[in-house]
Amino acid sequence: MLKDSGREKISDKRIDSPVSDDKFINKLFERLVALKVEFKNVDFRYCIFDAAYLRNCSFEECDFTGCRFINCNLAGCSFNGCKFDYASFDKSQIDNDILDVGCPGPENLKLKFARSLRMNYQQIGDAKSANKAISIELQATEDHLHKAWKSKESYYRKKYKGLDRLKVYGEWLEFKLLDLIWGNGESSWKLFRAVLVVLLIITAIHVIGFGNPSLVESYVEALWMSPQVFLGIVSP
């Protein structure tokens, strides 16, 4: 049985004066315009902002829980003490300092928030902001997986029991292993270190199996050959 969701559509409106202690819950704002407007303690829960132009506005203690920002321009906006639980962003211009002041507290919500912004920045070609979001997403993912199997917090112990707890422990181990090897794709130094370790192992195996461990020349020759063995160009 289909019922009306009760979402009100507000199209082609402009806000030109400060807004304080107001509620706009479950609204669809289409092409909303505001420039250098102050919003204080405004409730925007579950709103959808479609093609909104909100440049250089300030938002203080506003609630954006469950909001969606689609094709919006939020450049120059500041957010202080705002709530972004379950908020998502799609092809929207927004300064990356929101990652410093807007992340939700719980790790599972923080990683979803950072992931949404990371994908958003990738969509608009902002590599620097995407990298910043990735760093926060990875740290939040590690913290979430660690708490999921180890924390005594009621949320985690209620959600992850028995085999689910064991499974998430395996995911945490995999995450830590990939972080150790190559920083989950974000650390060139860790990748270089991992390759160097592999080359040294190949060198040691070659010297023990085919060279003379008492001769320095055997180590030099084996080390010289190790990249070719690693790449499959030659056989040991």
PLM-predicted stretches and their roles:
Residues S116, K132, Q139, F175, ...:
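Charged/polar, solvent-exposed surface patches and flexible loops
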Residues K159-G209:
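Transmembrane alpha-helical segments and their cytosolic interface motifs
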